[in-house]
UniProtKB/Swiss-Prot annotation:
Residues 2-40, 41-86, 89-121, 130-172 form the Beta/gamma crystallin 'Greek key' domain. Pfam families: Crystall. The gene is GM1. This is Gamma-crystallin M1. The keyword 4Fe-4S does not apply. GO terms for biological process: lens development in camera-type eye; visual perception. Crystallins are the dominant structural components of the vertebrate eye lens. Has a two-domain beta-structure, folded into four very similar Greek key motifs. The lineage of its organism: Eukaryota, Metazoa, Chordata, Craniata, Vertebrata. The keyword Repeat applies. Disulfide bonds: none annotated. It comes from the Eukaryota. Keywords: Eye lens protein, Repeat. One of its GO terms (molecular function) is structural constituent of eye lens. Monomer.
């Protein structure tokens, strides 16, 4: 179980809120968050309530200016704890939504689905084992999305409209 402390102002100033589990709407506890400390574990922060929209991955460390770190002053409204470790990792990725197009299966990190599988993009996936981060661009760059075991039939339904993913990485003991 992880632990994160949010602060209303930069440099760990102002009111604080301590969190050790998922929170679907952090605005219930504080009006804004401009810095945080991850004392243990890993967390994914989401731009909108109920784990929707743009995401940002946080591991153990201090984040003294969240707005500067996240693109264009993005604020976040919900947070999810990334539970680990998993010994097995397995995911099926599909080129199109709802099981469409080419399907490939992976059990390890993939820095480019174009190079490895000759797939133009990934728009649907089924995570059988482990927790993963999917990235918008090859070589683990760009916007990201956190996935835990389950079926993800349409990234659009998760508030990621127009997103396509080109690389994916397992969440192991990197937290």
């Amino acid at each position: 179980m992880g632990k994160i402390i949010f602060y209303e102002d930069r440099n760990f100033q102002g009111r604080s809120y301590e969190c050790m589990s998922d929170c679907s709407d952090i605005t219930t506890y504080m009006s804004r968050c401009q810095s945080c400390r991850v004392e243990s574990g890993c967390f994914m922060v989401y731009e909108r309530p109920n784990f929707m929209g743009m995401q940002f991955f946080l591991r153990r460390g201090e984040y003294h200016d969240m707005q500067r770190m996240m693109s264009m002053g993005m604020m976040f409204d919900s947070i999810r704890s990334c539970r680990y470790p998993y010994r097995a990792f397995r995911m099926r990725i599909y080129e199109r939504e709802y099981f469409g197009g080419q399907m490939s299966e992976l059990m390890g990190d993939c820095d480019s689905i174009m190079d490895r599988f000759r797939m133009s993009d990934c728009m649907y996936c089924h995570v059988m084992d482990g927790h993963w981060l999917m990235y918008e661009q090859a070589h683990y760059r760009g916007k990201m999305m956190y996935l835990r075991p389950g079926e993800y039939r349409s990234f659009r339904d998760m508030g990621m409209s127009g997103m396509r993913f080109m690389s994916m990485r397992r969440i192991t003991d990197m937290c």
